[in-house]
Amino acid sequence: MSIILIGFMGAGKSTVAKLLAEEFTDLDKLIEEEIEMPIATFFELFGEADFRKIENEVFELAVQKDIIIATGGGIIENPKNLNVLDRASRVVFLTADFDTLWKRISMDWQNVRPLAQDKEAAQLLFEKRMKDYSLVADLTIDVTDKSPEQIAEQIREKWEIE
């Protein structure tokens, strides 16, 4: 059974997934392979609606495997993805307050985040998404004062993963 990591940008989903399994699936990377371009470029060319459609198709295939999946922060924007998450039995919501996440996002030069160009807009998006993350989560972890290793250990303990 898969473990699916959800949460806002900057919560550490990909970092924690790497600690849980040597072979994990970063949904954003799978999507980039499918669309053959960076997500930020796709957003510019085709918009968010087309991106969410492809994201759902790739996600539906990924959850059929017994793997660790790090999702993009907007996975919950598509009602179809909410249904998939609701059916999944091991969904982990990594959360923190907005200021903590914004600081992480601002310091991350490796990832271009199309929806994180403006702090006020990002905060509105954060507030909008929080409820949906909580609704589908089987485990919620506040990552504010925890290292990625501590978070991974908490997940391992919950589902007795080695």
UniProtKB/Swiss-Prot annotation:
Binding of substrate, residues: D28, R52, G73, R129
Catalytically driven reaction(s): shikimate + ATP = 3-phosphoshikimate + ADP + H(+)
GO molecular function: ATP binding; magnesium ion binding; shikimate kinase activity
Protein origin, superkingdom: Bacteria
Chain sites annotated for binding Mg(2+): S14
Any one GO biological process: aromatic amino acid family biosynthetic process
Pfam families attached to this UniProt entry: SKI (PF01202)
Cofactor(s) required for function per UniProt: Mg(2+)
Entry-linked InterPro entries: P-loop_NTPase, Shikimate/glucono_kinase, Shikimate_kinase/TSH1, Shikimate_kinase_CS
Main location, first listed in the record: cytoplasm
Entry's EC annotation: 2.7.1.71
EC top class named in words: transferase
Annotated positions binding ATP: G10, A11, G12, K13, S14, T15, R113
Cell compartments where the protein resides: Cytoplasm
Cofactor note: Binds 1 Mg(2+) ion per subunit.
Family: Belongs to the shikimate kinase family.
PANTHER family the record matches: SHIKIMATE KINASE, SHIKIMATE KINASE 1, CHLOROPLASTIC
Function: Catalyzes the specific phosphorylation of the 3-hydroxyl group of shikimic acid using ATP as a cosubstrate.
Name of the protein in question: Shikimate kinase
Organism: Lactococcus lactis subsp. cremoris (strain MG1363)
Gene for this chain: aroK
